[in-house]
Amino acid sequence: MNFKALLIFVAIAFSSPSWAETDSLNLDASDTASQSEVPPAADQQWKSDIALIIDKAYELTGIKYKLGGSRPETGFDCSQFVKYVFEQALNLSLPPSARSLSKMGETIKFEDLQPGDLVFFNTRKSRFSHVGIYVGNNEFIHAPRTGKTIRVESLTKNYWLKRFNGATRVDPKETL
């Protein structure tokens, strides 16, 4: 593991031990960065911001789903859950629908997912009809549907894998 990868791993590992594992970081052993190279301050800041996003999302597990809900007291729908997490964790204002969220940031391939990425699904015979936050280890956290609560689920579960529509990595500069 090179120095850059070690820094990222340590920053995330000490932020939230429940989800920080090297597999979820997609660290590439072939990265040829020198031992003395330090990631730019903005990049390091975003890595620590990811921990805030994941921690805030986990704090909300168990809260009920409510269509159009946007507060912990009343419940959340999927997109309002994502919007709330990013606002509370980073003071970033995101759009209120899964479809509009899908247009933000950089498109990410399934195999390149990193914690904090938004994952999208076709759950209503419509592209980008559901959204969650990737937390690592092929898992994501989301507000599923009426009668359910915010929870962590496996992306590799057949139901979600068949409905996976894509992922994006939110650029904080886009939201200002």
Feature map (PLM): residue ranges:
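Catalytic cysteine-centered active-site loop
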Residues: 40-44, 63-115
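N-terminal signal peptide c-region/cleavage motif recognized by signal peptidases
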Residues: 15-17
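Aromatic- and glycine-rich peptidoglycan recognition patches
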Residues: 2-3, 19-31, 37-45, 108, ...
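Structural motif
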Residues: 116-118, 138
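N-terminal targeting signals for Sec/Tat export/insertion, comprising classic cleavable signal peptides
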Residues: 29-59, 63-66
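Sec-dependent N-terminal signal peptides
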Residues: 6-13
